[in-house]
């Protein structure tokens, strides 16, 4: 099976619940980046955009956040959710520009629609959107079936704390930029990813989702790195995959690193919370900062 399946999971979960009595203590990727000359400091937290209601983050994370003057996130999802007109306009980016999803998906449409119907996922509204939107809907379904919800994602927890303490919020990207990445994904790759996913046993897909969450929550860097390093590129789609990878990871990570570098240069103290894969997909954020700052990984106890 082509391992490109994990692109669907990583891309959707890192880009766009369950409850239990016992606390769900997590130990996510966390780094301290400093410039000895200016005294500038940046804390970099690798986030998961979904989580559990009972998630407990280490005290060290909130202590570091409290030291900083600003929280930088990919986008302020709370502000976006409160601005329905802006959200509606951003969603238009994912609409089919010519025809409908059936035209876009061609001969794969009936099989994909049947799968979505069987999973109680299908809505006629989906027919207005490109396959990337269908993949996002499937990822949300998978997350819910695994006991995760975007209501308990790391970025939301950090934003809630920062706003409670009147911190400055910096958006490194916009919803429009993120949706455009999905819209720009080559159609052949969108269709391949979606088709491959619906042809995979659903329990296997859930297992991949749970493994991604486990690796993040335990800061299993080897597992996180392997999810990118072991990708098998579909035959004939090498160029399309390379462009998608640049848009989803490399280009964004260079921009994130530039924000950190500027903060360090100015002697600022900032807290940066972005999807964990941006700390591991080469060249990652830390690669762009190598030799320009002192980088320390912060490990947590059990």
PLM features per residue range, with description:
Residues 2-10:
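Sec-dependent signal peptide recognition
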Residues 9, 54, 282:
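Active-site-proximal flexible loops/turns
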Residues 11, 60-63, 262:
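Structural motif
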Residues 15-18:
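C-terminal motif of bacterial Sec signal peptides marking the signal peptidase cleavage site
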Residues 20-22:
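Bacterial signal peptide processing site
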Residues 26-31, 256-258:
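Alpha-helical scaffolding within the catalytic cores
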Residues 29-247:
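Structured, acidic catalytic/metal-binding patches in enzyme active sites
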Residues 238-302:
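A cross-kingdom marker for long, charged
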């Amino acid at each position: 099976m082509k391992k490109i399946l994990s692109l669907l999971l990583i891309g959707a979960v890192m880009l766009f619940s369950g409850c239990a009595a016992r606390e769900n203590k997590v130990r996510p990727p966390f780094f301290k980046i400093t410039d000895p000359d200016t005294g500038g400091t940046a804390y970099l937290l690798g986030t998961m955009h979904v989580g559990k209601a009972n998630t407990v983050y280490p005290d060290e994370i909130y202590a570091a956040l409290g030291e900083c003057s600003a929280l930088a996130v990919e986008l302020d999802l709370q502000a976006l959710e409160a601005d329905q007109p802006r959200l509606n306009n951003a969603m238009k980016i994912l609409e089919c520009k010519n025809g409908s999803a059936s035209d876009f998906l061609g001969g794969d449409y009936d099989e994909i629609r049947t799968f979505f119907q069987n999973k109680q996922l299908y809505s006629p509204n989906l027919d207005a959107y490109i396959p990337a939107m269908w993949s996002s809907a499937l990822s949300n379904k998978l997350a819910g079936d695994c006991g995760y919800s975007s209501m308990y994602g790391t970025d939301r927890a950090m934003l809630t704390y920062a706003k409670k303490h009147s911190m400055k919020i910096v958006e490194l990207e916009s919803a429009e930029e993120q949706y455009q990445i999905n819209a720009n994904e080559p159609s052949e790759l969108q269709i391949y990813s979606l088709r491959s996913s619906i042809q995979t046993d659903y329990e296997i897909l859930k297992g991949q989702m749970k493994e991604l969450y486990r690796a993040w929550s335990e800061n299993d860097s080897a597992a996180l790195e392997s999810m990118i390093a072991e990708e098998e590129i579909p035959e004939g789609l090498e160029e399309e995959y390379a462009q998608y990878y640049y848009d989803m990871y490399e280009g964004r990570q260079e921009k994130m690193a530039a924000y950190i570098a500027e903060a360090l240069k100015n002697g600022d103290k900032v807290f940066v919370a972005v999807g964990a894969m941006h700390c591991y997909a080469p060249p990652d954020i830390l690669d762009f900062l190598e030799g320009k700052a002192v980088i320390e990984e912060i490990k947590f106890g059990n």
